[in-house]
Each structure stands twice: as structure tokens, then as C-alpha cells.
Curated annotation (Swiss-Prot):
This is Phosphoenolpyruvate carboxykinase (ATP). Its cofactor is Mn(2+). One of its GO terms (cellular component) is cytosol. NCBIfam families: pckA, PRK09344.1-2, PRK09344.1-3. The gene is pckA. It comes from Pelobacter propionicus (strain DSM 2379 / NBRC 103807 / OttBd1). Keywords: ATP-binding, Cytoplasm, Decarboxylase, Gluconeogenesis, Lyase, Manganese, Metal-binding, Nucleotide-binding. Pfam families: PEPCK_ATP.
Length: 530
């Protein structure tokens, strides 16, 4: 049968799947909508977006992620709490049970790519038991043309079976849920969780392994956009720090909102879609993202919906704080269609400072940039991980520690080399609290963060004056159009300056304690950047 046929009975034998019922092969969005409704997987909201629930897991199950410890990757992977080793034999036994589970079931396949640059893109095959997860893959990855589908040979396959539960005592997992990456077999297994973010972040993990190791390409947890003069900018930051929001600017074209590579030619997006946090999404401050929540093809994950009127409530967090919208990049009006741009002129490192002591924006030296990149200070923002209810200070290296398969200094050295070669200006932006810590101060307005970033990107801040923060050694601008000058130095916003000094000193100590593990791998200038 040809690839333009919607269903077939065979085609997955190379993955050991020999007895499935119907296989929906790269079905279009409309077919997936039909199946989602028919199978009771979701509801169509009043403006056409699809509302789904993920059940028990409403965020990443970080403790359930493993990498198979096998010869091809043993020496390269940074084993530890993030990259937990999994026994190859246990993997094979678990996979056999998953194959048996798929017998007689309908399956959905999306043949697609990760990586907008054709020279570096990774051919993928995403196999799911639920139609809405297939739509998620169709939204998030780069779609293959009909001609490419005829010749598609996946380098990696991902099998997602939320209805299949592991047995910890037999399988060596921690719970019924599991996300297991096998770099040698080029296979990812996901079970026991319906949270769609596991699909995209598993693919991101393998890109974070393959690209630096095989091609010396820097893989980054970042968003990126391009200005009217062709100047591109990179926004680093963990989930919930503002990457998606602040890079979706009507005056700049969006390259992508979450994952990118940086090679000798410039930047390229890994994905073909966005996965935006939408809790309490405001149409006035985030009009482009808000508009996507009212579009056919968008998936609204864990968003409250009135089952009678089919109207959604983006302010309702009764199910989770981590409500999400998955949509193709084409839902955003101002994008870079190719997903490719030149070398960045500016790098923005976003942090959600729960202590409220970092300035809203500061200019970094190259040494400070590498220090803060390796530190990855931010807060675990409520809802993005299972069990996290409110912001908690944390250090997540490379602003994406849970997804970095290699030693962080591999990514840090690649970043240092590229910043130096291309003379990139680097900025640290606090989208967290001002006037006090979480619970006392106020969250910095999106409009202020956007004004500060725009002033950094257009050169206004660089042309102005700066003062040096005595605790972190950061260069703080003394003024910025559209932002109250008194808030630029955070000490001025605290009612008790002595308490600010004490809190800032404690955070400096936390930075230095965390950085000791990187000191053997970096220069003295970087080690002493704070």
C-alpha cells in the first residue's frame, strides 16, 4: 500500500511489531481529530482546539527516566541522578512485553524529522497507541513531504504506550511509569504516563547526545528569534521562565520556542511546533500565543473545559498549574519558515529568581556568561515537574539539566568557543521576583521583561550607563525606556535593605557551592566570575 493510504496492517516489522490491528500511517490532523473524538480521547473546544487530559502525570516524571547503559554510550553519558543507568537485559524483557501489549491494537505512526537543517536533521518514527499523542508528534516535529515519506528511513523510533504499566519488582523501574532511552538500539520506550512532554523531551535528550558527540554542534534548551535587520537572539531558560512568551514578539520573527542547534553556519530549530505553558494566559500581554488556543489543530493539555458549552478556562488550575498548548509553528503569524538563521548577536539567559535578589537585567562578561550557563540558576516553577507545587530555588546546568546526556562542560566549552568567535553579547534576565522573595515580592511584569530585552537587542542598553552589583559582580543598567529605574537595582526595591544583603549573600554562597564541581574543567577566570 502507498504512504498516502490512511491505514494499513503492516509496516512496523523492523520494530518487532508484527500483529497490530490497524496502523494509521502519518495521518493528517483532520483524521486524527476524527479518531480522537471517536475513541473518547478528548473534546473539541468551541473555537476548534482539542482539549485532552493526561491523568495521573501532569508533568514530567523526572525520576522515571533512564538511559540504557550499553557499550556505545557508556563512556560518554554523564551518569548520575539525571541520567540513571538501565540494564540492557531488563530493557529487552520490557520491550518484549510491550510488543505483546500491542498485539491486536490500533496504532498511530508519525514519520517526521527533528532538526530544520537538512544536513543535520534526524529521521524519526513516533509510534503511539493514542491518536492525540500522534497529533502531538505531528504538531511538534518537522513534517515530512509526501516525497520524503516514500523514502523515509527512521534513525530513531519512539514507542509511547500510556496504557502499558511497568512492574517495578520485575522491570527495575521506580514505578509503573518509565521513559527509557536506548542509544545503541536507537529506540525510546515510554509507558505508564500520558504526559505528552515526555515525547518531545526524550527526542531532545538524544539530540543532546548525538549532535555534540558526532558533529560538535551545540544543542541548546532555548528559544530563538530574528529581528528586522537579520540579527538573531537566543533565549536560554527552563520551563516556565518565559522562553516561549518573550521570544514570541510581533516585532521579531520566531525561529523556535524551545530547542535549537548552533553549528558553523548559525542557528536551526529542532522542532516544527511549540509547547507553551498557558496557565492564566493573558490575551493583552501574549496575544500571539493566546490566538493559538483558539485554532483547529492546537492541543490544550489539562486545560479546564465546560463540557456543555465547550468553552475553556485558561485561568483554572484545579487540575494542574502545568497547562499546555501544543501547536505547529505555522499557527504563529511571524515566523522564520525555514527554521534557520545566522549566528546570534545576543544571548539572553532567563532565570526565575525565587529569592528576588537578581536584577531584572544585567550585562555579562564572557566569563560570567559561561559561569551562569553552567550554573543554570532558576526556580522549579510550579507544575512543570510532578510534585512541585511552588517555586523552589535550584541549579539546572545549561538551563536544561534534565535533558543533558553529556558532561555539562561539553556544552559549556562549545558555548564559550562560539561566544568568543562571533563576539556575542550576553545578558542575564530575571523574570522572577522583585521587591522581596517569593511570597513577599511581586513577579516582574512580562511587559517590563519585554521592554528590557528589546532595549538589549536594539543596543539601547549597551549605549547607556551601568552600575556594578556588589554581590554578584553584575553590570546593571541605570535606566531603560518603559521600565521604572528604581526597580533595575533590586536592593532598592526591598523595604529592608539589610535583609536583601543577607539573602543575596546566601544566594552567592549557594552559587559558589554548586559551582565547585565544574572548577576542575574551567579556567580560573570563569571559576572566579562570581
Amino acid at each position: 500500500m502507498k504512504f498516502n493510504d490512511v491505514t494499513r496492517g503492516t509496516g512496523l516489522e523492523e520494530h518487532g511489531i508484527t500483529n497490530a490491528n490497524l496502523i494509521y500511517w502519518t495521518p493528517p490532523t483532520s483524521v486524527l481529530y476524527e479518531q480522537i473524538i471517536k475513541r473518547g480521547e478528548g473534546l473539541v473546544s468551541h473555537m476548534g482546539a482539542l482539549a485532552v487530559k493526561t491523568g495521573h502525570y501532569t508533568g514530567r516524571a523526572a525520576n522515571e527516566k533512564f538511559i540504557v547503559d550499553e557499550p556505545t554510550c557508556h563512556e560518554n553519558v554523564a551518569w548520575g541522578k539525571v541520567n540513571k543507568p538501565f540494564d540492557p537485559q531488563k530493557f529487552d524483557e520490557l520491550y518484549k512485553r510491550m510488543l505483546a501489549y500491542m498485539d491486536g491494537r490500533n496504532l498511530f505512526v508519525q514519520d517526521c524529522f527533528a532538526g530544520a537543517d537538512r544536513e543535520h536533521r534526524l529521521p524519526l518514527r513516533i509510534i503511539t497507541e493514542r491518536a492525540w499523542h500522534s497529533l502531538f508528534a505531528r504538531n511538534m516535529f518537522i513534517r515530512a513531504t509526501p516525497e520524503e515519506l516514500e523514502q523515509h528511513e527512521p534513525r530513531f523510533a519512539l514507542i509511547n504506550l500510556p496504557g502499558f504499566h511497568a512492574i517495578p519488582s520485575i522491570d527495575g523501574t521506580h514505578s509503573e511509569a518509565f521513559i527509557i532511552v536506548n542509544l545503541g538500539r536507537k529506540l525510546i520506550l515510554i509507558g505508564g504516563t500520558s504526559y505528552a512532554g515526555e515525547i518531545k523531551k526524550s527526542i531532545f535528550t538524544i539530540l543532546n547526545y548525538i549532535l555534540p558527540v558526532e558533529k560538535k554542534i551545540l544543542s541548546m534548551h532555548c528559544s530563538a528569534n530574528v529581528g528586522p535587520k537579520g540579527d538573531s537572539a537566543v533565549f536560554f531558560g527552563l520551563s516556565g521562565t518565559g522562553k516561549t512568551t518573550l521570544s514570541a514578539d510581533s516585532s521579531r520573527a520566531l525561529i523556535g520556542d524551545d530547542e535549537h542547534g548552533w553549528d558553523d553556519k548559525g542557528l536551526f530549530n529542532f522542532e516544527g511546533g511549540c509547547y507553551a505553558k498557558i496557565i492564566r494566559l493573558c490575551p493583552e500581554s501574549e496575544p500571539e500565543i493566546f490566538a493559538t488556543t483558539r485554532r483547529f489543530g492546537t492541543i490544550l493539555e489539562n486545560v479546564a473545559i465546560n463540557t456543555r458549552t465547550r468553552r475553556v478556562d485558561l485561568d483554572d488550575d484545579s487540575f494542574t498549574e502545568n497547562t499546555r498548548a501544543s501547536y505547529p509553528l505555522t499557527h504563529i503569524p511571524n515566523i522564520v519558515p525555514s527554521g534557520i538563521a545566522g549566528h546570534p548577536a545576543n544571548i539572553i539567559m532567563l532565570t526565575c529568581d525565587a529569592y528576588g535578589v537578581l536584577p531584572p537585567i544585567s550585562h555579562l562578561t564572557k566569563e560570567q556568561a559561561m559561569y551562569h550557563f553552567l550554573s543554570g540558576y532558576t526556580a522549579r516553577v510550579a507544575g512543570t515537574e510532578a510534585g512541585v507545587k511552588e517555586p523552589t530555588a535550584t541549579f539546572s546546568t545549561c538551563f536544561g539539566g534534565p535533558f543533558m546526556a553529556l558532561n555539562p562542560t561539553v556544552y559549556g566549552e562549545l558555548l564559550r568557543e562560539k561566544i568568543s568567535r562571533h563576539n556575542v553579547s550576553c545578558w542575564l534576565v530575571n523574570t522572577g521576583w522583585n521587591g522581596g522573595p517569593y511570597g513577599v515580592g511581586e513577579r516582574i511584569r512580562i511587559s517590563y521583561s519585554r521592554a528590557l530585552i528589546n532595549a538589549a537587542l536594539d543596543g539601547t542598553l549597551a549605549d547607556g550607563s551601568f552600575e556594578t552589583d556588589p554581590f554578584f559582580g553584575l553590570a546593571i543598567p541605570t535606566s531603560c525606556p518603559g521600565v521604572p529605574s528604581e526597580m533595575l537595582n533590586p536592593r532598592n526595591t526591598w523595604s529592608d535593605p539589610a535583609r536583601y544583603d543577607d539573602t543575596a549573600s546566601r544566594l552567592v554562597a549557594m552559587f559558589r557551592s554548586n559551582f565547585t564541581k565544574y572548577q576542575p574543567y574551567v579556567s580560573a577566570e570563569v571559576a572566579n566570575a562570581l
